């Protein structure tokens, strides 16, 4: 079983904890996750530069993800035009299972290699691919 699909140790007995205990567990988990960012600042800077360079050269920003990460990528990508004026033609979103009818969950799409290969055909030299994962 993948790590992201396993039950977190703090979730055991969660239904027996108070609301405050549950909120504290969730809050502390977010704080721990945020601490990881400081270790990745140089990589984040390089990624931001790659994105800016792609946009300035007229190339695409391509978000690639599955599941809820795909939804986050879509939300981020769609915000770039109104917020930063990046033409929508330079923003592409690849989500396992597609973007149509996202109100229905699609199982087993994350590992569809043929669909991934087909989706990836839009990527061209100079594009910046942003891969998101839970």
What are these regions (language model features)?
Residues 39-56:
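A short, well-structured juxtamembrane/interface segment
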Residues 1-36:
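Cofactor-/ligand-binding subdomain signature composed of acidic, glycine-rich
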Residues 21, 46-50, 115-118:
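Well-ordered alpha-helical segments embedded in enzymatic catalytic cores
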Residues 37, 81-133:
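Glycine-rich oxoanion-binding loops at beta->alpha junctions
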Residues 59-68, 125-134:
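A short, small-residue-rich loop immediately preceding and capping a beta-strand
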Residues 14-18, 43, 108-115:
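Short secondary-structure boundary/capping elements
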Residues 36, 44-45, 61, 65:
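Flexible, glycine/charged-enriched surface loops at secondary-structure junctions
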Residues 68, 74-81:
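Glycine-rich loop at the start of a catalytic domain that most often binds anionic cofactors/ligands
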């Amino acid at each position: 079983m993948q790590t992201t699909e396993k039950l977190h140790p703090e979730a055991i007995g969660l239904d027996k904890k108070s609301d405050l205990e549950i909120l504290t567990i969730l809050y502390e988990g977010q704080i721990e996750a945020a601490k990881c960012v400081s270790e990745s600042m140089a990589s984040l800077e390089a990624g931001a530069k790659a994105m800016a360079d792609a946009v300035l050269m007229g190339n695409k920003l391509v978000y690639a993800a599955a599941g809820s990460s795909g939804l986050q990528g879509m939300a981020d990508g769609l915000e770039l035009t109104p917020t930063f004026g990046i033409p929508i033609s330079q923003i592409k979103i690849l989500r396992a299972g597609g973007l149509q009818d996202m109100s229905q969950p699609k199982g087993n799409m994350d590992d569809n290699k043929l669909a991934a290969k087909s989706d990836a055909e839009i990527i061209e030299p100079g594009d910046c691919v942003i891969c998101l994962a839970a």
